[in-house]
Amino acid sequence: MGDVVLAGIVAVAGCVQWLTGMGFALVAAPALMLLLGPVDGVLLANCSAGIVSCAGLVSGWRGVRPRAMVPFVAAAVCTVPVGAWTASRLPEPVLMVVLGALVCLAVGLVVHGLRMPGLAGTGGALVAGGAGGFMNAAAGVGGPPMSLYGVNAGWSMREFVPNAQFYGVVVNVVSVAAGRLPRLTGRSWVVVGGALFVGAVVGWALAGRVPERGVRGLVLGLALVGGGLTVGKGLWGL
């Protein structure tokens, strides 16, 4: 039963990622934390999101903007160890509350799309990248700061997606390296790989047929519910 639920979470998140270019971690991380615990849930979200981003980058690497992304990912790499250290030092119930709250905060940032002119330049890339690295290592949701940076830089979705995928590859690889691989059985790893493939196929088939706005709303709704449940589970265990 556990592997069936795991497959469903990863497949849905993978499908969403292929439909919108982002959203894997927002959908998967809260659910995986509830299923596997905060540490292994975040680590698996990082592993899977890195694989999905790498697959997407294969066809979109020409759209990466090095001038913007080098300071962004450099800042993220510097703060990933801080996020991993923080997560490793907290008791599990407290960690669940903190991670759930970070997920809810991430949803709020995406929904409001804060306009801050200072986030458009190199300084903004450093600030957003630093926040993203910490949030990715601690809670598996490093995408919202990237979204805010893209909004304030005036990027279109076509410009945003390859840069977000590049960031996703780097920050997730570093996040896993700063921690460890999630403790899964060989069978569960096969399930995850198969679910990622199924999610990609379904997402590719539905691309252009499903309204992006509706998918985005579903992503944020699922993430908010998952974050709230994670907070509730943590509070229950205190």
Task: Please place each PLM-identified region on the residue numbering.
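Membrane helix-loop-helix hairpins that form the core translocation module of multi-pass transporters
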Residues: 39-112
